[in-house]
A protein has these predicted regions:
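Iron-sulfur-associated redox domains of electron-transfer enzymes in respiratory
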Residues: 1-366
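Short cysteine clusters
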Residues: 16-19, 65, 70, 75, ...
């Protein structure tokens, strides 16, 4: 049959020039009967098929995507098909996360002489897509605007908000010594912000600046974000455990030089989710002070006093944190924060919630929440691993990945690009979630991509 019964569907095919395209040509020369739904895009190698190509096609309305390359050990570029398989298998597992049926995507091998195999592959895939029917369009999905009140998992370790005065004094002395010895031009830390609830980055250039340094539950920023800006300069940085993972990743990618960075660490007992605190105290004009004692956070706002258990207002990442101490440091102040033996981090509440949704509801969830995105790119700017902001795909016109159209598809595609670019690189610091002014849980995409990557590594 030349065309399957019923209306033609839009199926996109990315075919390797050397093998699969030749196989399709062989099938055509031999006049093998095959469906006509497929629209072929010829590529030099399947390894050149960026996972974002199929993703964009499916998000833009394609009913199916087929990628076909050379057989294993037969690639004209030695390893292109191995790279393709690794990336595209990961993509196939990622598709259900955003509500796309993975059966709409296929990756296979066809050589130039296998005309009959090509006929069988394209016919079987087209029949499968026809059984699934036209793909649901992202923009037509029923939006799910409400974020349910999720049951937060118990923290992996006791969370606190007190500061050890002796450790703080030791940390300040270490920083002063580094500045006085001219080991660094400046040291990055935190200082009190515009009100009692907020902290801001602090650049300590002189020993007297060190007295402004604060440490505690308000130190929510990951200062590792700023390190690539100062590559080639001698700088110091104060880190929490999660921040230090960002430093390690930057070092691994040669985005900073180890000999140029002096790392100061101290045990972290958790940081607060500012939005959670504000939700609990309600509409206030000014937060005058925030202090901590043990596991209790004390907030004074508009002349009223509030008390909260630290575990009720902590960031989600702190509940599952397994690295409260800096994994890399030149100086460490105080005693390390301990984790109970045998403790295993629980699945983040948002991931448990999304795993329980159907494909249709997942698409509706992201359709509803991404609709609130204002494209401010705060998630990108806060991410320690987003280091190509000077040529970001969100702004670039060559290549022209995204338009400036205010549509849910364009907004979602940016977040998917971000998640793909962070595959294997995301440290789980949660800065994208924290920075989003609209409260969109974009970090869940990165967490689920990381989960897929770790599972793939275990299988290999």
């Amino acid at each position: 049959m030349s065309v399957l019964t019923g209306k033609e569907l839009r199926i996109v095919g990315f075919l390797c020039n050397w093998c699969s395209y030749g196989g399709a040509d062989t099938a055509g020369v031999a006049r093998f009967t095959q469906p006509t739904d497929l629209r072929i895009i010829r590529v030099p190698c399947s390894g050149r098929v960026n996972p974002l190509f199929p993703l964009k096609a499916l998000l833009s309305g394609a009913d199916g995507v087929l990628v076909s390359g050379c057989h294993p050990r037969d690639c004209h570029y030695s390893e292109g098909n191995y790279y393709a398989r690794r990336r595209l298998e990961t993509l196939k597992e990622f598709l259900p996360i955003i509500g796309i049926d993975p059966r709409r995507f296929e990756y296979t091998w066809v050589s130039a002489s296998e005309g009959q195999r090509w006929q069988a592959v394209v016919t079987a895939f087209t029949e499968r897509v026809h059984k699934l029917g036209p793909a649901p369009k992202f923009e037509d999905a029923k939006p799910m605007y409400v974020m349910p009140n999720l049951d937060l998992p118990a923290p992996l370790r006791p969370l606190g908000c007190g500061v050890n005065p002796a450790a703080m004094t030791e940390l300040k002395d270490q920083i002063k010594a580094a500045l006085e010895a001219k080991e660094v031009e400046f040291v990055m830390g935190w200082q009190k912000g515009f009100d009692g609830l907020h902290a801001t980055p602090l650049y300590m250039r002189k020993p007297e600046d060190v007295e402004k340094l604060i440490w505690g539950p308000l130190n929510v920023h990951s200062l590792a974000t700023y390190l690539p800006l100062f590559k080639g300069k001698k700088v110091g940085i104060v880190v929490k455990g999660c921040d230090s993972r960002g430093v390690v990743e930057l070092l691994q990618e040669n985005l900073i030089n180890r000999e140029d960075v002096v790392v100061f660490g101290m045990g972290c007992n958790g940081t607060i989710d500012i939005n959670r605190v504000l939700a609990k105290i309600g509409d206030v004009t000014e937060v005058e002070s925030v202090t901590g004692s043990g596991a209790t956070l004390k907030v004074r706002a508009d002349g009223k006093d509030y008390e909260f258990a630290m575990q009720d207002v902590a960031q989600d990442k702190c509940r599952a944190c397994t690295v409260p101490n800096a994994v890399i440091h030149d100086h460490f102040a105080g005693s390390p924060t301990n984790i109970p033996d045998g403790a295993q981090p629980a699945m983040p509440a948002i991931m448990t919630f999304l795993d329980g949704l159907s494909l249709e509801d997942r698409m509706g969830f992201w359709r509803g929440h991404i609709d609130r995105c204002i494209r401010c790119y705060a998630c990108r700017n806060a991410c320690p691993m987003c280091v190509c902001r000077d040529n970001c795909v969100a702004d670039s016109r060559e290549p022209h990945w995204l338009t400036q159209e205010d549509s849910p598809t364009q907004k979602m595609f940016f977040q998917l690009i971000h998640a793909m670019h962070l595959a294997g690189r995301c440290t789980g610091c949660g800065e994208c979630n924290r920075a989003c002014p609209m409260g969109i849980p974009v970090g869940a995409l990165k967490l689920q991509m990381g989960q897929i990557g770790r599972a793939s590594c275990r299988e290999r």
